[in-house]
Amino acid sequence: ALVFFIRPLNIVFGTMNSDLSFKQKMLLAWLAPRGIVAAAVASYFAIELEKNGIDGAQLRAMVFLLIAVTVLSAGLTGSFVANLLGLKRKSDQGWIILGANAVARALAKLMKSNNEEVILIDENPSLCRMAEKEELKVIYGNGLEENILLRAEVDLRKGAIGLSENEEVNMLFARRTKEVGKVPRTYISIKRDDEGVTADMVDEVGAIIPFARAIDLEKWSLWVRKEQIETKELIYDNKEEITAENAFDKETEGLILPLTFLHHTTLIPIGHNSSIKKDDKVGCLVRSEKLEQFHDWLSQSPFSISS
């Protein structure tokens, strides 16, 4: 009676003026409350009964047994019931980006436009406000702290991308997301291949270099802030596969910044090891003042502008 009648009735009255859906109320009725109040009250009444010469031990034992059974049943069946009601959050959903700089926001907006959930994390309040103005989800705080990562639901994410202007912090972020959330895919933005955090070091930790190569993130952020870039979508026309780092080599530095990679219906941030196949699409930023140079490169490349 307590589990199937009294507790659900309690939830119905307790959530009467809330915005919870019927299914959410059903889940609450199955999982809550857990019995701490009942335990305290039972102990109090047991003591009072014993003061009056009545054995209260049986009452206390019965209440604690009921609590143990209901907690155990909720723990074992909670996931199943949530899934049955369609309320269980799917794993492998969305991305976390460390940094809310202009490039990070440009990447987040492009991914969001393709129905990918993205959460930015940054300690800079002004950058967080800019992200909010652009209608992006952002968390203010240190992305290396476990509580911040848990707020971003790191354990449910497809991947994590370190895009701060400090490449050592990006490396630590990739490691922390794997430790805390077992994130399957991590990206580490670096400045150069042979100094500081190198490409070999990124490979050693099983991470990926975003943008297909090392980049000067500060310069690209400046160009984005000054609106000196244009967004382009390229389509790969060649039958032979090519890796992103070969497709966007040193000739494209300061000219093109590849951001995303679309294969069939799956969009992910492009990495140095992304394998580009025929009809795959690459979302990128192009310097406005170098459009002529971009078109010259395009005419000799295996890409064309997606219509």
Where do the language-model regions lie?
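Transmembrane helical segments that form the transport core of multi-pass membrane transport proteins
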Residues: A1-G14
